[in-house]
Curated annotation (Swiss-Prot):
SMART domains: EFP, Elong-fact-P_C. GO terms for cellular component: cytoplasm. Disulfide bonds: none annotated. The gene is efp. It comes from Nitrosospira multiformis (strain ATCC 25196 / NCIMB 11849 / C 71). This is Elongation factor P. It is found in: Cytoplasm. Involved in peptide bond synthesis. Stimulates efficient translation and peptide-bond synthesis on native or reconstituted 70S ribosomes in vitro. Probably functions indirectly by altering the affinity of the ribosome for aminoacyl-tRNA, thus increasing their reactivity as acceptors for peptidyl transferase. Pfam families: EFP, EFP_N, Elong-fact-P_C. Keywords: Cytoplasm, Elongation factor, Protein biosynthesis. GO terms for biological process: peptide biosynthetic process. CDD domains: S1_EF-P_repeat_1, S1_EF-P_repeat_2. PANTHER family: ELONGATION FACTOR P, TRANSLATION ELONGATION FACTOR KOW-LIKE DOMAIN-CONTAINING PROTEIN.
């Protein structure tokens, strides 16, 4: 484990706090006037229990960064509420629940390459590619002449994800979607 200064904590980092592994959701610097000193306000989520907490850590304090072993895997298929991945190195299969994946399952198509992070041989998180290409299965038809405003319309993709798209995007077309924000990037 590596100790890092509180000022080096970044969103997405995994840190050990109170003998548990936490994922940093938000992190910002807070300066309290007078002799109060400076702090890092850190919002983090327990990766096992799913609980969230806010901690104020003095900037001069050090925290343990959790050792994470990344493994390249491929999403194979969905079986009920479980998603089956295959390790690219040893071809072992891993089943992860929909709850574990939270909102990430809406970006998964068969043969999508992902990085699964492990801590002490236990899966603790999935890192998706920066963007994915999905097919629109349902959206409102394009209204001719409705170009005066730059409005967006909802579109449902093949995975069930709802994305706001420009009016010119039609049902059956493929679009690129940002996996971090869920936003439309471009039509393919």
């Amino acid at each position: 484990m590596a100790k890092v200064l509180a000022t080096e904590i970044r969103v997405g980092n995994l840190i050990e706090w109170d003998k548990r592994i936490w994922r940093v959701l938000k992190c910002y610097h807070v300066h309290v006037g007078g002799r109060g000193g400076a702090f890092m306000q850190v919002e983090m989520k327990d990766i096992e229990a799913g609980t969230k907490t806010n901690q104020r850590i003095r900037t001069e304090d050090k925290v343990e960064r959790a050792f994470v072993e990344p493994r390249e895997m491929t999403f194979l298929y969905q079986e009920g509420d479980n998603y089956i991945f295959m390790d690219k190195e040893n071809y072992e299969q891993l089943s992860l629940s929909r709850d574990f994946l939270e909102g990430q399952y809406e970006y998964l198509l068969p043969n999508t390459d992902v990085q699964v992070n492990f801590h002490n041989d236990r899966a603790i998180g999935v890192q998706l590619p920066a963007s994915v290409v999905l097919t629109i299965t349902d959206t409102e038809p394009n209204l001719k002449g409705a170009t005066a405003t730059s409005s967006y319309k909802p579109a449902t993709t093949e995975t069930g994800l709802v994305v706001m798209v420009p009016p010119f995007v039609l049902q059956g077309e493929r679009i690129k979607v940002n996996t971090d924000s869920g936003e439309y990037i471009e039509r393919m």
